[in-house]
Amino acid sequence: SRATMTSRAIPMPGGSPAAWPHVKDIFQAVSAKVEGNVPCCEWVGEMGAGHYVKMVHNGIEYGIMAAFAEGLNILNKADVGIQAGEHSAEVAPMEEPEFYQFQIDTAKVAELWRRGSVISSWLLDLTATALHANPRLEGLAGRVSDSGEGRWTVKAAVDIGVPAPVLA
């Protein structure tokens, strides 16, 4: 889990409601704390609910990361109107290239967003740090291994009839 890497342990325990009072103090002692030492840990439901909540949490996390990647890539390509575009049967000519002549420093934008935007977050902190160190993100694969959690979340949404286009 990322809790080890981030020092943000946020257990999402499930199980017998009768057992929770006996283990609550242990879970809350090791969990992250916010606002006056309030633990980031609560019992989330019966047996299996903790895994289910964590699965959906990770699906949301993947959606957020994808949104950052897509948005920052749009900013990164905002200078395409300056460059001579390729024209072929496979690539349509750009309409209105004059609208895409911005040379945007995505590392600076990510830093700005992480300091005061509604989308500021730990994930954006990591993104801004990575862009500052390596603005072109050279050497990165641009993909992550499939742990299955994203697919499980989408399958659960389909199974229970909840539209989840962002997570899909």
Specify the residue positions occupied by each region the protein language model found.
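Rossmann-fold NAD(P)-binding glycine/threonine-rich loop
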Residues: S1-H22, F27
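Helical "substrate-binding/catalytic lid" subdomain
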Residues: R8, M12-P13, H22, E35-A168
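A common structural junction motif
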Residues: V30-V34
